[in-house]
A protein has these predicted regions:
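N-terminal beta-strand motif that seeds the catalytic metal site of vicinal oxygen chelate
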Residues: 1-27, 68, 124-137
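Long, continuous compositionally biased terminal/linker segments
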Residues: 3-7, 52-88
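Core segments of cupin and vicinal oxygen chelate
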Residues: 17-55
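Vicinal oxygen chelate
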Residues: 20-25, 70-114
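Residue-level structural signal for beta-strand termini and adjacent loop
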Residues: 47, 98, 121-123
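Short beta->alpha transition motifs characteristic of CBS
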Residues: 103, 109, 120-127
Length: 137
């Protein structure tokens, strides 16, 4: 099976737990950057917060060196994800734009308070004429 043949609508994970060294700041980060993607804060219980499929918990050791990629429904959501995060004082790890990771791969990156690389991705299949092709490693 190839990248082109994969059914990208399939769910691979039910949820992900992220342990935070600064729980409140991590909740603020994810609340800020997930809102433009339509991902709500569903539940908060003391030292644990649920953002749809992502749980943020006040646990040690903190999760680090992780790359999380969230689906965006439009380029504008990717742009707003990055704008909201940087406006709130969080660090950019790459501005919105097309990447050479695949056709129509439009993404932006932010670093959460523990240094995890958090990405918003829109697969712009209607705009593949920008010369970027699949990149496989």
């Amino acid at each position: 099976m190839s990248v082109e043949d994969w059914d990208w609508s399939l769910r691979l994970f039910d949820h992900v737990d992220l342990h935070a060294s600064d729980y409140r700041e991590s909740v603020r980060f994810y609340e800020t950057v997930l809102a433009p993607l339509g991902v709500p804060k569903l539940l908060e219980r003391g030292d644990w917060t649920c953002f749809a499929n992502l749980n943020v918990a006040d646990r040690r050791p903190a999760t680090q060196n992780l790359h999380l990629c969230f689906y965006a429904r439009a380029k504008e959501e990717v742009d707003e994800f990055h704008r909201a995060g940087t406006a709130a004082g969080f660090r950019s790890n790459g501005p919105p734009g097309y990447r050479d990771y695949g056709l129509g791969y439009y993404a932006a990156y932010l670093l959460d308070p523990d240094g995890n690389n958090v990405e918003a991705l829109y697969r712009d299949v209607g705009n593949v004429g920008h010369g970027v092709g699949p990149r496989l490693r």
